[in-house]
């Protein structure tokens, strides 16, 4: 088995001509900045969530099997250069982009923070160091996907979001948004990468309230702490000056809270204990 590359969270290994191994680490990143500290058990939760969702969703995917507490085997495929984001709530970057006039929201949208959208929207981005939002025309113009592929990705991504939202709703969570990646396997568009709290926002229903920052059972907890303490602005300022942002130390209470919430989310949604 040959080591291929390290991503923000996963290490990839070449197993054979048709198989990859994903090793999930406890690493964490936010706002495209990698942090020095780990989040204990995060890799295990992401790994087992990937197994759960791939088995739960009725859509062709690259998952073969879980190999260990933090490793899965997947089929190799050619990934499509587009990140398929589905948003069900007026939150996150959608809010700032809407305020700048960079994106339209469905007619009748309540533009109060965290309000549910009338219908989930497909809001894809490029796949790059800093993902750039794109629309259908741009995706086709940039030769990222064909029109037929785009239409399929939009329809399927929204269907997956709705199914996942129903599953999370049944156990007391709101799935606010979701990021999916697809590839081509045997001439068929196939769900790839992994699905877990690094790919979606998850809010507990019992504390949900429109107009406020929501309690996060995902990576948003770290993002909110960074924003509240001025670090997001520091990162942006550093990049504007051509410098690499310097990650601060994450407080121990944020680290332990992230571990606790990741574990709780998995146990409630999957019905299995870790």
Curated annotation (Swiss-Prot):
Keywords: ATP-binding, Ligase, Nucleotide-binding, Purine biosynthesis. It is an enzyme of class 6 (ligase). It catalyses: 5-amino-1-(5-phospho-D-ribosyl)imidazole-4-carboxylate + L-aspartate + ATP = (2S)-2-[5-amino-1-(5-phospho-beta-D-ribosyl)imidazole-4-carboxamido]succinate + ADP + phosphate + 2 H(+). InterPro entries: SAICAR_synt/ADE2_N, SAICAR_synth, SAICAR_synthetase_CS. It holds the Pfam family SAICAR_synt. GO terms for biological process: 'de novo' IMP biosynthetic process. PROSITE patterns: SAICAR_SYNTHETASE_1, SAICAR_SYNTHETASE_2. One of its GO terms (molecular function) is ATP binding. Pathway: Purine metabolism; IMP biosynthesis via de novo pathway; 5-amino-1-(5-phospho-D-ribosyl)imidazole-4-carboxamide from 5-amino-1-(5-phospho-D-ribosyl)imidazole-4-carboxylate: step 1/2. Its EC number is 6.3.2.6. The keyword ATP-binding applies. The keyword ATP-binding applies. PANTHER family: PHOSPHORIBOSYLAMINOIMIDAZOLE-SUCCINOCARBOXAMIDE SYNTHASE. Belongs to the SAICAR synthetase family. This is Phosphoribosylaminoimidazole-succinocarboxamide synthase. It comes from Nitrosopumilus maritimus (strain SCM1). The gene is purC.
